[in-house]
Amino acid sequence: MRKDYLNSNKDSLSAPEKEIERALRPHVFADFTGQEKIVANLKIFVQAAKERKEPLDHVLLHGPPGLGKTTLAHIIANELGANIRITSGPVLDKPGDLAGLLTNLGPYDVLFIDEIHRLNPIVEEYLYTAMEDFKIDIMLDSGPSARSVQLNLNPFTLIGATTRSGLLTSPLRARFGINTRLAYYDVTLLTQIVKRSSQILNVPIEESAAYELARRSRGTPRIANTLLRRTRDFAQITGSGTITQQIAQMALKALDVDEDGLDEMDNRILSTIIEKFHGGPVGISTIATACSEESETIEEVYEPFLIQEGYLHRTPRGREATPKAYKHLKLAPPQRAGTLFE
């Protein structure tokens, strides 16, 4: 079962958790930590669009969950001084849903579509002319009396976010003038984020404790903030309210987050590949079945970090465990078979 701090679905958070997440979210570029090159470029693009009194070019933000795509979308809207309308790909089931959103946008407003790779193909086609020409064709009636009516739209900026940019169609991808990929964070930046969030939450934290949480956060700010909130609970109930390194280590152990930031499901994936399938290669659907998890969840939430950190290899024949995975699980790697001439 997926841990809540790895949950890529922001909508699954409770109302109080959503309020806390909003409070922790930066609202301007100056408060956003990390992704320096991306932020520097976006500052220039936003300022130039404002000076020309033009809509900002459409923006595609892609990368693993929890790195700040939604936060950047809100910051862009704030910096533009524009309203933002928020939706997601699966919600836009019919062209009429999209038309309703687009026709209600004011001049230079921002439309943010999360999980844009999951757009209905029919809806996506309607989006093309809206993005290029700020027009949309809608069908009135049906059958022999059906007719198409073209509606003019206010100039707007579409911001799309996706964890799986490879699933975007070429025509849709080509219509984004600004295409950026967010990268995992290093421990130094995550430590800064943990300390900033602790100040907002008004919870004292030791430097060593902030570092401890940061280094086990899988390079992901959202996970760092969630671990901070859970550790705050332990500090409140079992300590003096201050998050010490000892409290942090105790909380992380209780949450099954090991020294390398891997949780119970990470270790289950690795041990499944090694113990049930002799280290691989093995297909993702087979791994998902063996681990009682969805293939999409493994691909989007767990696999990117495991590959990034060198625990997994992705090959044409499937996933393979690396020597680092064997070492992490304290297992002996298999001996390579000798060649004919050895």
Curated annotation (Swiss-Prot):
Which GO annotations describe the biological process of this protein? DNA recombination; DNA repair
List ligand-binding residues for Mg(2+). Answer: 70
This protein's record includes keyword Cytoplasm = yes
Write out the GO cellular component annotations: cytoplasm; Holliday junction resolvase complex
Q: Which chemical reaction does it catalyze?
A: ATP + H2O = ADP + phosphate + H(+)
State the compartments where it is located.
Answer: Cytoplasm
Which EC number(s) does the record attach to this protein?
3.6.4.-
Q: Which UniProt keywords apply?
A: ATP-binding, Cytoplasm, DNA damage, DNA recombination, DNA repair, DNA-binding, Hydrolase, Nucleotide-binding
Query: Which InterPro entries does the record cross-reference, listed alphabetically?
Result: AAA+_ATPase, AAA_lid_4, DNA_helicase_Holl-junc_RuvB, P-loop_NTPase, RuvB-like_N, RuvB_C, WH-like_DNA-bd_sf, WH_DNA-bd_sf
Is Hydrolase one of the keywords UniProt gives this record?
yes
Chain segments carrying region Large ATPase domain (RuvB-L): 1-185
Please give the chief subcellular localization of this protein.
cytoplasm
Which Gene Ontology molecular function entries are recorded, alphabetically? ATP binding; ATP hydrolysis activity; four-way junction DNA binding; four-way junction helicase activity
Functional description taken from the UniProt entry:
The RuvA-RuvB-RuvC complex processes Holliday junction (HJ) DNA during genetic recombination and DNA repair, while the RuvA-RuvB complex plays an important role in the rescue of blocked DNA replication forks via replication fork reversal (RFR). RuvA specifically binds to HJ cruciform DNA, conferring on it an open structure. The RuvB hexamer acts as an ATP-dependent pump, pulling dsDNA into and through the RuvAB complex. RuvB forms 2 homohexamers on either side of HJ DNA bound by 1 or 2 RuvA tetramers; 4 subunits per hexamer contact DNA at a time.
Check the record and name the HAMAP family matching this protein.
DNA_HJ_migration_RuvB
Q: How does it assemble?
A: Homohexamer. Forms an RuvA(8)-RuvB(12)-Holliday junction (HJ) complex. HJ DNA is sandwiched between 2 RuvA tetramers; dsDNA enters through RuvA and exits via RuvB. An RuvB hexamer assembles on each DNA strand where it exits the tetramer. Each RuvB hexamer is contacted by two RuvA subunits (via domain III) on 2 adjacent RuvB subunits; this complex drives branch migration. In the full resolvosome a probable DNA-RuvA(4)-RuvB(12)-RuvC(2) complex forms which resolves the HJ.
What family classification does the UniProt entry report for this protein? Answer: Belongs to the RuvB family.
According to the UniProt entry, the note on domains is: Has 3 domains, the large (RuvB-L) and small ATPase (RuvB-S) domains and the C-terminal head (RuvB-H) domain. The head domain binds DNA, while the ATPase domains jointly bind ATP, ADP or are empty depending on the state of the subunit in the translocation cycle. During a single DNA translocation step the structure of each domain remains the same, but their relative positions change.
Its recorded name reads: Holliday junction branch migration complex subunit RuvB
Name the source organism: Amoebophilus asiaticus (strain 5a2)
